[in-house]
Amino acid sequence: MKILLTGSTGYIAQRLLPVLLANRHEVVCCVRDRNRFNFEKYNSPSISVIEVDFLKPETLRAIPVDIDAAYYLIHSMSTSTGDFEKMEEASAINFRDYIQQSKASQVIFLSGIINEENLSKHLSSRRNVEWILASGSYSLTTLRAGIIIGSGSASFEIIRDLVEKLPVMIAPRWLNTVSQPIAIRNVIEFLSGVLLNKNTFNNSYDIGGPDIMTYKQMLLKFAAVRGLRLWIGIVPVMTPKLSSYWLFFITSTSYSLAQKLVDSMKVEVICKENDLKGMLGIIPVSYEDAIKEAFERIELNQVPSSWKDALTSSTLYDGISKYAEVPVHGCFLDYRKRLITHPEKVLLKIWSIGGKNGWYYGDWLWIIRGFIDKLFGGVGLRRGRKNQTEISPGEALDFWRVLIADRRAKRLLLFAEMKLPGEAWLEFRIDDQNILHQTATFRPLGLWGRLYWYSVLPFHGFIFRGMIKNIADG
């Protein structure tokens, strides 16, 4: 069967895609920028990639009309823009209007659990999207999930940040809100199980794990699984804004996402009973086992997707290709080169940069820069990296975004997502003469940009000099 997969670079789609291919489906992947999609790693003739932006109806003509079903996995929660509800509504309308002209008999939509009239903006937007999709001429199957637990999921990584960094927590009262977490493995089983299953047509289902817990209990259970001590005190007067700052400064989330999460976490998300898991033969994974499975993936360096790879920079929203061509004019440069004797070792070191491995020189200065970035509302250094030795275009790498990761050409190009009065690139390249080239490029924005460059210039002298030396030494 021919399946359309939207949001193909996203957390859920990257987990679902290998399952669809294993089930011998032909999959058409929709992406805004094909350079963010690592096509080669799948090595399958059953996959094709098309560039589609559902906010731009004219781009939808790239979608083939002979599809049998479509997954709607488009989500605007991570965007920094304030009108994400309008973006989600427009995307859903454009999707519906085009898909109902195709041969698709089913659309599958992954939403959030909706069981209260007083919904958060996020859940209200999800419900509105469901209504729009349900008005199409195809059959809609909606799966509503709560907290998703898996390596790289937003909920898992935020809980991990809190538990591993704060042995004592003074926390807001929404930690007493009840939720029903679900393992990412079960989510994928449900998504693949309902595909072209006529018993699920024009139905909606809440999906969750076997455990109903407060967020406080989830944190304590996580600590117990990891063998960590944790004490949590609840403060009833912590405002939503203060709660958002609490999440923002302690975890790797952006402030805009923290606001939306706090808004949603005040609402109980408990599944309404249904027979879907019995119909599909799915065995729910406990919260504890979901945590253990996530860490098994992390320890084996097998994290196929991460929520941190979602674009948080409005600058890059239209695609990374535009910034893959590093500007030459009107820029400041810090360029260094060094002859190397072991290019493969050096290349491995370049491909392992950031995250737990650090930046090979002056890590404490990078940490300070990341902290300053957080203070000004940036992403900071806490995003780390998904895989310790592999890297792909579009991935987040601390406060950088990977633009080019071409191992054959021995070139890595990064774009800064930190708060800056301008735009910055960092490039590593090994040429045919075994010379390592390291170039930091900064395109200033006005007078403040120029003042910024000269203020950090003294630090560049020894940071970049030490960095290239330690990389070149292999």
Predicted regions and their residues:
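Mid/C-terminal beta-alpha module of Rossmann-like enzyme folds, strongest
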Residues: K2, V194-L257, E268-D334
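NAD(P)H-binding glycine-rich loop region in Rossmannoid oxidoreductase-like domains
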Residues: N35, F39-S102, G112-N118
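Conserved beta-loop-beta element that borders a ligand/cofactor-binding pocket
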Residues: W131-G152, I158-D161, K165, I170
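N-terminal Rossmann NAD(P)H-binding glycine-rich loop of SDR-like oxidoreductase domains
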Residues: I3-H25
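Glycine-rich portal/gate segments that line the openings of hydrophobic small-molecule binding cavities
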Residues: C331-F332, L339-E344, W351-K419
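Terminal "cap-and-tail" regions of soluble proteins that handle hydrophobic small molecules
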Residues: D289, F295-T341, K345, W364-F371, ...
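Substrate-positioning beta->alpha
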Residues: A154-S155, W174-L195, N203
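Beta-strand/loop substructures that line and gate deep hydrophobic ligand-binding cavities in soluble
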Residues: F415-F459
